Amino acid sequence: MEAKATAKYVRVSPRKAGQICDLVRGKNVDEALAILKFTPRGAASIIAKVVKSAKANAENNHEMDTEKLYIASIVANQGPTMKRFMPRAMGRATTIRKRTSHIEVVVKEKK
C-alpha cells in the first residue's frame, strides 16, 4: 500500500528542490522530517510540508502505521516557467526565468 502527496506550481527551482529530494529519498519519514528541519535551504521547508501531508494521507486515508513509513519515491519535476523582463543598458532587456516545481512524494510501509 502507498500514499501520495503533491505540491504543484511551487516557486522554487526544480534543480534546487531535486538536491533536497536526494537527501531524504529512501529514508524513514520521521528521520526525513528531522533532516529537512535542519537543512538551511528554502526548498527544505516546502518539501517537509509535502512529506507531512503524505504521512497524514497514509494515516487517515489508508490506515497505515506511521512508524513503519519510508519515502519510496520523491521527485521535483519542472513546472511552468514565468518569464519576466529586466531592463538593461542601452535600451536592451533580458529575460528572467522564475522557475516552478511540481513536488511528488510517495510513502510506503516497511514490511
UniProtKB/Swiss-Prot annotation:
GO terms for biological process: translation. One of its GO terms (cellular component) is cytosolic large ribosomal subunit. It comes from the Bacteria. One of its GO terms (molecular function) is structural constituent of ribosome. Keywords: Ribonucleoprotein, Ribosomal protein, RNA-binding, rRNA-binding. The keyword RNA-binding applies. It holds the Pfam family Ribosomal_L22. Coiled coil: none annotated. Part of the 50S ribosomal subunit. Belongs to the universal ribosomal protein uL22 family. This protein binds specifically to 23S rRNA; its binding is stimulated by other ribosomal proteins, e.g. L4, L17, and L20. It is important during the early stages of 50S assembly. It makes multiple contacts with different domains of the 23S rRNA in the assembled 50S subunit and ribosome. The globular domain of the protein is located near the polypeptide exit tunnel on the outside of the subunit, while an extended beta-hairpin is found that lines the wall of the exit tunnel in the center of the 70S ribosome. This is Large ribosomal subunit protein uL22. It comes from Clostridioides difficile (strain 630). The gene is rplV.
